[in-house]
Swiss-Prot record:
GO terms for cellular component: DNA-directed RNA polymerase complex. GO terms for biological process: DNA-templated transcription. The keyword Transferase applies. The gene is rpoB. Belongs to the RNA polymerase beta chain family. InterPro entries: DNA-dir_RNA_pol_bsu_ext_1_sf (IPR042107), DNA-dir_RNA_pol_bsu_external_1 (IPR019462), DNA-dir_RNA_pol_su2 (IPR015712), DNA-dir_RNAP_su2_dom (IPR007120), DNA-dir_RNAP_su2_hyb_sf (IPR037033), RNA_pol_bsu_bac (IPR010243), RNA_pol_bsu_CS (IPR007121), RNA_pol_bsu_protrusion (IPR007644). Keywords: DNA-directed RNA polymerase, Nucleotidyltransferase, Transcription, Transferase. This is DNA-directed RNA polymerase subunit beta. Its EC number is 2.7.7.6. PANTHER family: DNA-DIRECTED RNA POLYMERASE I SUBUNIT 2. SUPFAM superfamilies: beta and beta-prime subunits of DNA dependent RNA-polymerase. It comes from Lactococcus lactis subsp. lactis (strain IL1403). The RNAP catalytic core consists of 2 alpha, 1 beta, 1 beta' and 1 omega subunit. When a sigma factor is associated with the core the holoenzyme is formed, which can initiate transcription. It holds the Pfam family RNA_pol_Rpb2_45.
Amino acid sequence: MAGHDVKYGKHRTRRSFSRIKEVIGLPNLIEVQTLSYKNFLDEGLANVFKEMFPIDNFAGTMELEFVGYEMKTPKYTVEEARAHDANYSAPIYVTFRLVNKETGELKTQEVFFGDFPLMTEMGTFINNGSERLIVSQLVRSPGSYFHLKADKNGLESFGHTTIPNRGAWFELDTDAKGIGYVRIDRTRKLTFTTMLRALGFGSDEEILELLGETQLLTDTIAKDVHKNPADTRVEEALKDIYDRLRPGEPKTADSSRGLLVARFFDPKRYDFAPVGRYKFNKKLALKNRLLGLTLAEPIVDPETGEILVNTDTLVTRDVLDLIEPLLDNGLGNFVVEPSDDAVIPEPITLQSIKVYSPKDPERVVTLLSNGNPDAECRVLTPADVISNISYWLGLAEGIGKVDDIDHLGNRRIRSVGELLQNQVRIGLSRMERVIRERMSSSENENITPQGLINIRPVTASIKEFFGSSQLSQFMDQHNPLSELSHKRRFSALGPGGISRDRASYEVRDVHYTHYGRMCPIETPEGPNIGLINNLSSYAKVNEYGFIMSPYRRVDRVNGVVTDEVEYLTADEEDNYTVAQANSPLTEDSRFANETVMARHTGNNIEVEASTADYMDVSPKQVIAVAAACIPFLENDDSNRALMGANMQRQAVPLIDPHAPWIGTGMEHQTARDSGAALIAKHAGVVEYVDGNEIRVRRTSGELDIYNITKYRRSNSGTSYNQRPLARLGEKVEKGDIIADGPSMENGEMALGQNPLVAYMTWEGYNFEDAVIMSERLIKDDVYTSIAIEEYESETRDTKLGPEEITREIPNVGDEALKNLDESGIIRIGAEVKDGDLLVGKVTPKGETDPTPEERLLRAIFGEKAREVRDTSLRVPHGGGGIVHDVRVFTRENGDELPSGVNKLVRVFIAQKRKIHVGDKMAGRHGNKGVVSNIVPMEDMPYLPDGTPIDIMLNPLGVPSRMNIGQVMELHLGMAARTLGIHIATPVFDGASDEDIWDTVKEAGMADDAKTVLYDGRTGEPFDNRISVGVMYMIKLHHMVDDKLHARSVGPYSLVTQQPLGGKAQFGGQRFGEMEVWALEAYGAANVLQEILTYKSDDVIGRTRAYEAIVKGERIPKPGLPESFRVLVKELQSLGLDMKVLDADRNVLDLRELDEDEVMTRPDNTEITPEMLEAQEAIVAQAEAEEEALINADTEK
């Protein structure tokens, strides 16, 4: 027997064909979300307050300090927030201290700071009752970047950009004449020496001494001449910069200095963030550009005076390891003094080392670094600017290297915590202005922190982020896998990211640094391809937001591959050689072969085993969770694998799902981490189980009660239903699955079913990937799912009185009311069809003026019956089903309702959706198709033992698509079912051909794994042997019930009077230009006429046609289409006088073309204008009499 048994959870054992020992398990798959939010609450929120406070008034006499904050208990639990359409959030109270610096008086006060959204255990937020999540964002990291560019003549030059987290950009560039320029915040350029002079290096000699002589520098100095002798060189430089940033404004040296300080050196305006400072120091550190250069000075130990490395030594990795600690401790540090009129006249610490130029080995080049400022320094420093220029000049000498912006060392993840932190910062900065003004304007005696603070900017900023940000998304809740995948997704779009239209091919493409960090397979098809990605299965995000991948460390001294795992970021990995996960190892964990396949900076190379630094932990660390659920992924074309991964996320939860016979071993952890299953929080013994709750007695004696969710409507309209898995008296451990969620079976993910599939054609019904299905799958409810739709009705106060929910509805018979209760609301369990009443509701009608007779009757008998119209909630087309739940919210019960709403009723209707012709099905390998025919069981082809086939697929769907994994799954699946064992074949480490054939043989199947099939209609065997087996097939969310729709009469567009389009508007089918041509080609004049008139926009004609059909009369001739009239009006609005003529060339009024509408009374006598005038006179007289009576009363 090939393979070995592995236990997945308590309830499933699979035979696994994996050969590679995995030293670590998968991390918690949603920790990207949960850890980020936890860090935000623990540190991030306090840090923002510390950044913004203290705030002082303009006079500097008062100061408002931040002391601390506390989160109180949430108003609602998660379930209550969901039911009440509320937010799951906790009130936050911040303590402030107001200090009066003149009197020394302190006032400390706790201020309510709004409700703060809380994350659920599943990594989501409840916002207005619906589950949302914040997708992480992939953005350029702040730091120092250098790039190579070529002009149209092919001349290469280098450019530089300093990108801060917040603040002005600093760029360096070279023009065609070889002059270097600086550009501040995308304004006009000026020579880069101007910037150096502004920093306090006025003379040409100082600049040349600092940076060394290079062609670019000398050419630029020659261009940068002293224009105004009245100013010093430093002042002139400052004014030049001011002129570029504020053109046209009067400039002085002091205002120029102030502006430059504000742009780059003021922490309020400029911020690198810790990640920016880390990247900046790393880029400019001398140790990172010495490798491969020759030293032009000896390296001396500062403590002992010993020469460690001689002049003319080539710096290898070993030499670098020797001098690296010295460089970190400040070897080569020196201080330069800028002139007194510099922008910042303080001493500047730099670090230098002399090397020979690789392009001219005779020349000595001085490399400068910024002296490694500490992480607290989050602004640009003069040392940063100088060392940036030094690095840039060094590139022309062949020293240093340019950056690749698509390298994952230069792109980072902004997770939910950081995104929220930014929103709070935006809110606080808006609030700061208000606080400062109030502090300056109020009377000092009675001022309190509460009086100074207006929390609206902060709460508005957070609310706006959750409500309308591109990164705050409605959670994809089709099934557990789609939930998990959505939480692990990150997007390059959104605020501060790139836009879909400008994204180049390079940004979207797979990069070598994605290995083990970002999935190369799972990404959407269409305009977002490559911009929205998923985290690889083992990847984690570090504190700076860079994605790390785990590797086993290789002990190079004794050649052992240790079980010690290290997480490396993309730029750290570039320094090492990493062996592949499938490199064979001996019993004592050494490489079995002398050479191994390895990766180094994106190149796949064969290296000696002794030179490998690390080894991959697992073959599936390359890909994301959804792709890792596809067995035999290695045998599928990547385009089809992409579709397979994406389509698994669209699977509809079935009534009785089954886990696949052929899995990958990922099913259990995916189900557990998705948040859909119920997980034991503590170890204990199950004391009670039923459909609604599970009680577990902890070992410590306490009782845990777990509520089971039954048939809740998910975000996607599918049924979210949990089933208990734990048994009475069972011992459970912490982290065990005690109840299956939707699309789960025995603690494993179960998106579909395991039908018996044959690859064969059948009467042409599986042309173009269509799927032929046996009636058994309908009878046995194999592919039946439940759809739950929510409908709501609310009563409001109108100008004419309040709306009312009632059984008393005008013109509705008793039959229609039979399922409504006494208050007019449908009962739970009622079966309803299209158009049935769900909630009876009446709205007051606008009353017409009463006639004198009515007025008299009203005076005698009092208030007449109110005029109301029926505004009841009815079942829309295609919405029939069983009423599964009704919820009523009223103010009396203490429910929070929107203003103006008195009562809100929610009705949930569940539909049992059996599989139909037109529903979309798919396998896991991107093989999708639409059900084209449902064949009676007795007509389906059958096996020699009489078992009928369940599904027939077209064999032509395999060769051109190159997804051979489906065929391997088919054969192995048949063997697994025959043997009654579940199988795990992990991706890139699964069952080999030999394993499959051995298992097929073990199951007693034929040598070619094919079989003779018999035609169910004739009983004759088919000519050829056919591949028959078990394949995992899923039913997708694209169901025909949601798409099919029909209309006879319905709503029309206001202007054109043509029917609306689309199912949501109950619209018609568009008969477009090309369809009209088709009918014209056949000369079908009458059909054409009725399509362009009655069925479209001949308003009067269609009404008459309808009447005629109802009365059974001949249909009258059509009139004029409304669109003709619209065209005429359009031309008239352009000033073109357009007239319509009859056959005798008489001008017709457009209105005459329609026969006059005749107004009739209820007794069918015609109403004449005289009658109308007489009626008007009677009304006027009655009004005059009434007015006279009122006047007489007031006079009395």
